[in-house]
Amino acid sequence: MPGTAATAIPEEVEVVASARSDDLLTLSAIAVFAFIITDVLCESGRAAVALLTISPAGRLSSIGWSSAYDNVWVDASGAAIGLIAALVFCILFRSFKTSGWSTRLFLLLCCAFAALSGAGYFVVAGFTDFGDWYTRLQGLHRWTALSVSLVIGGAMVYGLALFALSRGFGQLFTERQRVRRILLISWRAAILVYLCSAVLNPGGRGEIALSSLPIVTISDFGLFFVSLFLPRRASAAGEVAKLDRSFAWIGTSAVCALLFIFVLGRGLMLSR
């Protein structure tokens, strides 16, 4: 029995050490790059819908599309594009099984940010009337059929996204503590860059409050719950190696983050 206890402690220490061995800068870079990609896809897609339908001009920024000519379909397109993007990234993740695990982690984080933000729009907007669905719900009494449908439908999609993401992370990692650390670092790094870009938005506090920023920040917090749904495994034999420092990821992410904050954060005027 003493031998069993003695071997249990080193094994626990080994798991903790492994959970902390991934390079912090590289992991943050992958998360930031994934977040920027999904945000640009959603917001630029929304801008494209607006310009192709009703808006002759508007401002595209990191926290949303702003125009005096938008309608409910333009306001709704952000969430829809996010969910479509999540599905595409999920397919890519499942297809690139032989790629390096840092690449697969990038695709999985892209899927996570897009899915949680997209589904979160429905849930939060059904309760609060702000974000992309703010215009659609303006003037309606609380708990109409539309708002109830948004909350219920969004919650179902959100739960499905958490379940699917847990299966994805379960294919890469077997250590729960390692997954928690990866998700914590990813959320902090992504939201920090997002907030930095929002500070430079020329629309001021009012536009920021009604932008996608509050919903995205709250929705992506769901990353912390992914580890709760990880499949239980008896052995960690399939655990991937630690993430070493990659200046390719760090450099690419740094350039994109600077452009995201100082260019897209200030907004770009677009017209037909």
Please report, for each region that a protein language model flagged, where it lies by residue.
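Alpha-helical transmembrane segments and their helix-start/interface "positive-inside/aromatic belt" motifs
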Residues: 18-33, 99-111, 245-251
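Metalloprotease/metallohydrolase-associated module, dominated by Zn2+-dependent proteases
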Residues: 66-168, 186-201, 223-231, 256
